[in-house]
Amino acid sequence: MLSQNEIINKMKRILFLCMTIIFITCHKSNDEAPQSNPNPPTNTYLYGITIDDSWDKTRVTVQQIVNAIKAMPIKPTVRIVMSKGTAIADYKPLFLAIHQVAYVMATPADSEDMKKYTNVDSYVKRFQDSYEELSAYTDFWEVGNEINGEGWMGDNPQFIADTAYGAYKFIHSKKAKTVLVSYYFKPDDQKVTMEDWLKKYIPEDMKKQLDYVLVSYYEDDNDDYQPNWQNVFNNLEAIFPNVKLGIGECGNNDYKKYSVQSKVQRAKHYYSMPKYVKNYVGGYFWWYWVQDCVPHQNSEVFKAINSSIKQTLK
């Protein structure tokens, strides 16, 4: 017969074993969560918001971000921009939490980091490592960010195009969704127009098989110039006839500098844009979404984005 102490110790061991099994099962379930299949038909919109590392300097918590996403009228696509100086594994908790309430677009290489890549292989490895760590929580992969930017991207456009093509081929081989983000600007601000750059440097197979081409544009960087978006997307449709098109970044270049009212007006402008061409699918991906919208309960920008989305759903 077991003594009372032996019975207690045995019960403790059984309890510990049960708790360990529960933890491993839950952890494995989360890690092996099936990848969402957004694969929307051509006429289905993306409603995007962006999270970059700058939010981490605020007092906002991941749970507050999740709560704000859950309060949106649709399941959004959250674009998570990753910094090269941050370990890929460090993003896993954020990706996991966001993917439970939204589609996720990973941006492993922001345009601001492009000069840190000295060869195509190092750029592709960034995507290989990111895919290995985060693919279970990622629905879209941005293979090139502001791909045609001059100056801050470096002075070798063919090299930039080759890096994006390398990342595209890798992600495409995994049968995952590929996204290319181009950069629009006021007339004569760069040597080569966005459209001409894309025609010249993007390989033909990539033009045909990309899933999305989205356009980044900031009025703050372009003297408040307002593009003729109908013409822009007509031109893009001619270059990428089989690809879904939309806006890949918008908002302000400094969230502290501009008034709430100006942000509200800009948010309404973008999130209520019409369907310019057959393959237009929205996007938008407001850059400082966390800083402008979280906590969401009293955020006028959050309300403006949501009300505009609701209008397009009618």
Each PLM stretch: what is its role?
Residues I24-T25:
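C-terminal motif of bacterial Sec signal peptides marking the signal peptidase cleavage site
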Residues P34-K84, W287:
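Boundary/entry segment of secreted carbohydrate-active catalytic domains
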Residues Y47, T138, G246, C250-K314:
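Substrate-binding cleft of secreted/luminal carbohydrate-active enzymes
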Residues Y47-I51, P76-I80, V104-P108, D139-V143, ...:
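Hydrophobic faces of well-ordered beta-strands that scaffold small-molecule active sites
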Residues V62-E133, G151-V181, Q226-W229, E237-F240:
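Aromatic-lined substrate-binding rim segments of carbohydrate-active enzymes
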Residues A102, A106-P108, N145, S182, ...:
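Aromatic- and acid-rich polysaccharide-binding/catalytic face
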Residues Q128-P157, V179-P187, Y217-E219, G282-V290:
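Active-site groove signature of glycoside hydrolases
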Residues A164-E195, Y212, N242-Y255, Y280-W289:
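Aromatic-lined carbohydrate-recognition surfaces of secreted/lumenal glycan-active proteins
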